[in-house]
Amino acid sequence: MKPRATSSHGYKAQGNKALNGALTSKKKVSKNQVVFFDYRDERKLKRFINDQGKIIPRRITGLSAKEQNLLTHSVKWARFLAVIPYVVDEYK
């Protein structure tokens, strides 16, 4: 079987999204910040919800797995208590 072609740096020719910077500029949270999510803080939670009302994934927000889990629980609890809506009205 013939091996795949590689670039001069040794990476596969097909490329890697992390290497070409496709995902690096979309991060929403700096790694230097201490992240705490309060279900009552509507402004902070809305930063992590897209225009359809979905929670933005980890690969875009730049959160760790633990922080993303805390965010998810806070958003779900805020929706349950009607702090933020389940469905966004602006999306039509």
Swiss-Prot record:
One of its GO terms (molecular function) is small ribosomal subunit rRNA binding. GO terms for cellular component: cytosolic small ribosomal subunit. It holds the Pfam family Ribosomal_S18. Disulfide bonds: none annotated. Coiled coil: none annotated. It comes from the Bacteria. Keywords: Ribonucleoprotein, Ribosomal protein, RNA-binding, rRNA-binding. InterPro entries: Ribosomal_bS18, Ribosomal_bS18_sf. One of its GO terms (biological process) is translation. Binds as a heterodimer with protein bS6 to the central domain of the 16S rRNA, where it helps stabilize the platform of the 30S subunit. Part of the 30S ribosomal subunit. Forms a tight heterodimer with protein bS6. Belongs to the bacterial ribosomal protein bS18 family. HAMAP family: Ribosomal_bS18. PANTHER family: 30S RIBOSOMAL PROTEIN S18 (PTHR13479), SMALL RIBOSOMAL SUBUNIT PROTEIN BS18M (PTHR13479:SF40). This is Small ribosomal subunit protein bS18. It comes from Chlorobium chlorochromatii (strain CaD3). The gene is rpsR.
